[in-house]
Amino acid sequence: MISQLYETHVLPHLIGCACGAPQIMKQRSRLIPQASGRVLEVGFGTGTNLAFYDPAKITEIVALEPSEGMRRKAAPVIAGFPVPVTWLAEGAETAALEPQSFDTIVLTYTACTIPDPDRALASLRKALKPGGQLLFSEHGLAPDEGVARWQRRIEPVWKPLAGGCHLTRDPAAMITRAGFSITRIEAGYLPKTPKIAGYNTAGCAAA
């Protein structure tokens, strides 16, 4: 009961604050305007990315979000958006996505929480149209062993408090393993962010 209350009422606010930090918002502001056509946003959350889409370039956003608490918090944001936003209340691993149906798939600060990221990413690749793009920005495993060691130590405690967030996943490796071809990538520590959660990988990939 307490766990359910935490996940429904407390966690969405905590994640909204963390994912809305200035250094994270800067990453979003650089990535999201590149989206075009029919868009699938994986882990839509509280709708933080909406402010950065260019409505003139997109036709629809399908918002994949299994959390009822997140969807409820995002509702007022969606209400004022000029492009249709359609909810898909499922996880990325189980969602029935039509093959080759999206021009852009957006993955921002979500891969860390997906229970089976390999299965999810394989499904996303099939849902991307030929010539489409996967836009991603994710935190993950640091290249410095001292930081990585602390990530491994802290992760078991961190995960239940942070909605299942893993600190030790390698976003680029997961994306490549799923069959995507990364066409552009940049990585490094975000400023004014604890290094255990601040190693960021962002870029674009094709199916």
Regions found by a protein language model. Name each.
Residues 40-95:
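Class I SAM-dependent methyltransferase SAM/SAH-binding core
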Residues 93-105:
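A short acidic, Gly/Pro-enriched loop at the edge of an enzyme's catalytic core
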Residues 118-130:
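A short glycine-rich, Lys/Arg-flanked "PGG" loop and its adjoining helix->strand segment in the class I
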Residues 131-139:
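Conserved beta-strand signature within the Rossmann-like core of class I S-adenosyl-L-methionine
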Residues 164-179:
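Short alpha-helix
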Residues 185-207:
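Core SAM-dependent methyltransferase catalytic element
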